[in-house]
Swiss-Prot record:
Gene responsible for this protein: MYB25
GO cellular component terms attached to this protein's record: nuclear speck
Annotated region (Disordered), positions in chain: 181-216
Knockout-associated phenotype: Abnormal male gametophyte (pollen) development including deformed cell wall, two-celled phenotype (one regular vegetative nucleus and one sperm cell-like nucleus, both in center) and semtimes leading to abortion.
Source species taxonomy: Eukaryota, Viridiplantae, Streptophyta, Embryophyta, Tracheophyta
Protein name: Transcription factor MYB25
Provenance organism: Arabidopsis thaliana (Mouse-ear cress)
Localization of this protein: Nucleus
């Protein structure tokens, strides 16, 4: 035997049990398909058959799905004459699957469909994940035939599932990610809205509105005359000569005077009536709210007017002197520029042989 040990065929076949099992399944499927192909010459799915499924076709589809599993529908369709892979898949998923519920929809399932449809809309494949044993096609047909045409009063039944529970069941990973996020990233909680019954609403409508005995805690300020007044004299300081230009409102001195004149003056007496005053009867007659709310005003004195006049005169003089210096500097700069320009031009013309008469004309034009 040249050193080779002979092994029995049983040991050789037992080395790959998975592969041998798959081969056995494929052989059984091929044999089943061959039998079905012999029974009908039009098999193989080439000539499509439209209409209801026959009991023999349902039995063959059930046997093939048990052997191959609910997958590879094109291979399964070869064993059912006249049926395509899509037709086999829809027949199994909607009718023949043993997991499906064939009883009518219960009230709990209807309420769940209504609440899920209010949140998700017409996403029937997503809604079907909430109802085990119900297909998306069955849910859609039940919604279009029964639930959508129900009167509006039946929608007031309390929903068995809230929106948050629906989202948690459909998207658990998203809910975990939100719960682990920081407080700033949390979504706002939805307010729970209850549905009132018709009897309760009628009782509340019959009851008269109750008066609010307790006052609210909102602060409401009371109107009164202020304790501070603003001094706005009706005349300005007289100015003479050229200083009138600097005493305009747009000038620096005018703005400074306005800021001094219109500053709020704090009176020596308050306006709440707690300070002593000479005649309360005369003051109460002029007040809007009575003697307790009196507005005291202090008039400007003569000394203050003299100080303001002196300040304005000093500012005007300073502004006038500054403007004169600026004008003198600008004139000097212009003269210097003319001299330099004339000198440079004269020297250039002499070098070029220009006549002295033309140079004099240019100097006269510049002067």
């Amino acid at each position: 035997m040249n050193g080779e040990i002979s092994r029995p065929p049983e040991l050789i076949s037992s080395r790959n049990p998975c592969k041998s099992f798959e081969n056995a399944i494929h052989k059984a499927v091929e044999a089943e398909l061959a039998e079905l192909a012999k029974s009908d010459a039009n098999g193989g799915g080439k000539s499509k058959v439209k209409g209801p499924w026959l009991p023999e076709q349902d039995e063959a589809l059930t046997r093939l799905v048990k052997m191959c599993g609910p997958r590879n529908w094109n291979l399964i369709s070869r064993g059912i004459p006249g049926r395509s892979g899509k037709s086999c898949r829809l027949r199994w998923c909607n009718q023949l699957d043993p997991i499906l519920k064939r009883k009518p929809f219960s009230d709990e399932e209807e309420h769940m469909i209504m609440s899920a449809q209010a949140v998700l809309g017409n996403k029937w494949s997503v809604i079907a994940k909430l109802l085990p044993g119900r297909t998306d096609n069955a849910i859609k047909n039940h919604w279009n035939s029964n639930l959508r045409r129900k009167p509006a009063e039946q929608w007031k039944i309390p929903l068995l599932m809230s929106n948050t529970e629906i989202v948690y069941q459909l998207y658990p990973s998203m809910v975990r990610r939100i719960s682990n996020a920081s407080p700033k990233e949390h979504l706002p909680q939805e307010e729970e809205t209850g549905v009132l019954s018709d009897d309760k609403m009628d009782d509340e409508a019959k009851e008269p509105p109750r008066e609010q005995n307790s006052k609210t805690g909102v602060y409401r300020p009371v109107a009164r005359m202020g304790a501070f007044s603003v001094c706005k004299p009706g005349y300005m300081a007289p100015c003479e000569g050229p200083l009138v230009q600097a005493s305009r409102p747009d000038s620096l001195a005018g703005k400074f005077l306005q800021s001094l004149c219109y500053d709020p003056i704090i009176p020596s007496k308050c306006g709440h009536g707690c300070c002593n005053h000479q005649d309360s009867t005369t003051l109460s007659s002029s007040s809007v709210l009575g003697s307790e709310f009196v507005d005291y005003e202090e008039h400007s004195s003569a000394e203050l007017d003299k100080e303001l006049i002196s300040i304005s005169n000093d500012l005007n003089n300073t502004a006038w002197i500054r403007s004169g210096k600026e004008a003198e500097q600008s004139l000097k700069a212009d003269d210097q520029f003319r001299r330099e320009y004339a000198h440079s031009k004269f020297s250039g013309m002499v070098n070029n042989g220009v006549s002295s008469q033309m140079v004099r004309q240019d100097l006269r034009a510049l002067s």
